[in-house]
Amino acid sequence: MYKLVLVRHGESEWNKENLFTGWTDVKLSEKGISEALEGGRVLKQEGYSFDIAFSSVLVRANDTLNIILRELGQSYIDVEKSWRLNERHYGALQGLNKAETAEKYGEDKVLMWRRSYDIPPMPLEESDKRHPIHDLRYRGIPKSELPSTECLKDTVARVIPYWTDKIARAIIEGKKVIIAAHGNSLRALVKYLDNMSDDDILKLNIPTGIPLVYELDRDLRPIKHYYLGDEDKIKAAMESVANQGKKK
């Protein structure tokens, strides 16, 4: 049996302000730093250690991972970063307030944009400075692969090849793996691991900073999964994520 730990980054400054973030590189809030610290402490209390870590190229995920590894006394382990683990790209919604967007377009449409499997928001124009073609960290990636908007289906299409080529291979080699990423890149992976339907993934809420453990068989099929930490806090955190796209 293998164990895999997934962690959504702690609350970011834009999470706090209820803004669509996507590929915008936003730092952790004070609460987010505390969430990452607590996640590290819980993992330490439960006796977890890791051989390799995977993360996106966005600072909120990187900082969450660094805080957790410091708590574990494991800042020395290898960390592999990839844009394929980035948050879903929210297109022209990036920077907009979720509740205000719900007021303008209706909760149903915002929920569809946020959580539907195959309907992306309005795209960014390539001339828009928010488009990733203008970000030097992506200069080695073919322009055709950089999104101007994404639905979850698009996110799955970039996450799963990375899972297969890099992460799954490390697990099969016997390495203990932690992934620090984002709500939608982790939802993409969970959908794949649990073979969830397109409808069921709509209801999945992954809270910030709380370790999610997957126990996998030798073929990397899930045996069970569970969050580490206080059950009431976990429930409240999941409800908070679910309420982000509702009207004020």
From Swiss-Prot:
Q: Give a yes or no for keyword Isomerase in this entry.
A: yes
Q: Which InterPro entries match?
A: His_Pase_superF_clade-1 (IPR013078), His_PPase_superfam (IPR029033), PG/BPGM_mutase_AS (IPR001345), Phosphogly_mut1 (IPR005952)
Going by the UniProt record, its keywords in alphabetical order are: Gluconeogenesis, Glycolysis, Isomerase
SUPFAM superfamilies referenced in this protein's UniProt entry, alphabetically: Phosphoglycerate mutase-like
Residue numbers binding substrate? 8-15, 21-22, 60, 87-90, 98, 114-115, 183-184
Site annotation (Transition state stabilizer): which residues?
Answer: 182
> Which reaction equations make up its catalytic activity?
(2R)-2-phosphoglycerate = (2R)-3-phosphoglycerate
Q: Which is a Pfam family this sequence falls into? A: His_Phos_1
Set out the biological process GO terms recorded for this chain's protein: gluconeogenesis; glycolytic process
Summarizing the function annotation, the protein's role is: Catalyzes the interconversion of 2-phosphoglycerate and 3-phosphoglycerate.
What's the name of the protein? 2,3-bisphosphoglycerate-dependent phosphoglycerate mutase
- Annotated source species: Borrelia turicatae (strain 91E135)
Per the UniProt record, the lineage of the source organism begins with: Bacteria, Pseudomonadati, Spirochaetota, Spirochaetia, Spirochaetales
